[in-house]
Amino acid sequence: MQLLQSSVIAATVGAALVAAAPVELEARDSCTFTSAADAKSGKTSCSTITLSNIEVPAGETLDLTGLNDGTTVIFSGETTFGYKEWEGPLISVSGTNIKVQQASGAKIDGDGSRWWDGEGGNGGKTKPKFFYAHKLDSSSITGLQIYNTPVQGFSIQSDNLNITDVTIDNSAGTAEGHNTDAFDIGSSTYINIDGATVYNQDDCLAINSGSHITFTNGYCDGGHGLSIGSVGGRSDNTVEDVTISNSKVVNSQNGVRIKTVYGATGTVSNVKFEDITLSGITKYGLVVEQDYENGSPTGTPTNGITVSGITFEKVTGTVESDATDIYILCGSGSCTDWTWSGVSITGGKTSSKCENVPTGASC
């Protein structure tokens, strides 16, 4: 009888343990972290990571690199960062099939005013870059609300990354913010940015190298516009198969532009600007320049970088009266095979300094 009772008890306990196992596994699948240190140490033990009101210590990165395949990252509450002069980044995420998103009402606030001094990355305080999406492959970033980046917002070096409905609001930096690029893309393929809303003080989009890149349904306010480049002078100097469409650029220095580096070699090909609306542009509505040296135009173009297969279609709107509607400064023979349709930019001056304007385009 005692043996029978023992067997029954053992069976009952065994059944309970089996029943409990899925509950224990589920707990391991979902983790909530309230510190950057815990997130870094525990990031590979969870398939869903919730970052709850994290205060990242000064001089440290919220390190979410090397995540397990298929991990979901959720920003919850307010994510903030301690102050220190350093290069950053403040956030870094890498992995494959990663989903980065946020809970309702969440925000990520860089409090960039602590660094802003009007110098950006050119001097003054050393300012940390914000978000590295490097080797974040076959992944997505959705719905993030980002405020007040000290300098650059996203640095993207990935393959097959979709960024949807992200807001970067640096409107508080109108006076002292500088070089607050929203999306800088290099050495990447199949990057899709859809529905971005950007208030900043530099490029809304800057593609330095890469292929199969789209930017659609964007709103860019206060910065330097939608840019290819500057291209040249890096290890990768090819930009190809890019579509920038259905977007608005307002209250910005430039509307749409392509800029290449003086004396450099490379390729810009199969780039399309389509259905872009401009207003309140203060420098150039549409600009192509092949004269950049040390980040500034020289006025003398070179032809080592070819700019071919370019389409400007239905790029329309207005610039300020002291701005220039269109400026094209190409090297000899380097700008070819352009399609120019429905381009109407008015309100400013007509440039007398255009050179080597390709057939079909108008300056």
Swiss-Prot record:
Enzyme class, first EC level, given as a word: hydrolase
InterPro entries the record matches: Glyco_hydro_28, Glycosyl_hydrlase_28, PbH1, Pectin_lyas_fold, Pectin_lyase_fold/virulence
GO molecular function: polygalacturonase activity
Keywords annotated in UniProt: Cell wall biogenesis/degradation, Disulfide bond, Glycoprotein, Glycosidase, Hydrolase, Repeat, Secreted, Signal, Zymogen
PbH1 repeat windows: 158-187, 188-209, 210-230, 239-260, 268-290, 302-347
Cleavable signal peptide: 1-20
Propeptide: 21-28
Annotated catalytic residues: D202, H224
Disulfide topology: C31-C46, C204-C220, C330-C335, C354-C363
Record's function text: Involved in maceration and soft-rotting of plant tissue. Hydrolyzes the 1,4-alpha glycosidic bonds of de-esterified pectate in the smooth region of the plant cell wall.
Protein name: Probable endopolygalacturonase A
